[in-house]
């Protein structure tokens, strides 16, 4: 029996102007998400995968590959009581346009693909001395070989990386 997908509420911080208040909200949200992931997310993923595997319906090869991949991503390959492998590291912030952020929020999924020149960084939005001009410089350096346009960086999403998250580092 599949228990259903847990949903972690999206936090809208667009009305917060004070960097200290934003920092407190993001720290609280990060702690709540880490706790929620440990408590219910991985159990739900395992439940879903076990539900698919234990059905008597033959699984076609394409779906079988999805299940195998999902087992790996969901940290499910053996023992089922292993803790969710969330790294004890900083959040990653995907700085992008408001439209892109809204699309990710509606999909509740970030696929790592940006058509708008997103910048991913560990620098939080409440950091002192970080301005739009600084972000634009980062954006130009990161996207210099692929885009001549300057895209909006008016919004962000915060990601909590886990062990399966592949990071390509570009020092700016």
From Swiss-Prot:
Keywords: Crown gall tumor, Plasmid. InterPro entries: Glycosidase. This is Uncharacterized protein 1. The lineage of its organism: Bacteria, Pseudomonadati, Pseudomonadota, Alphaproteobacteria, Hyphomicrobiales.
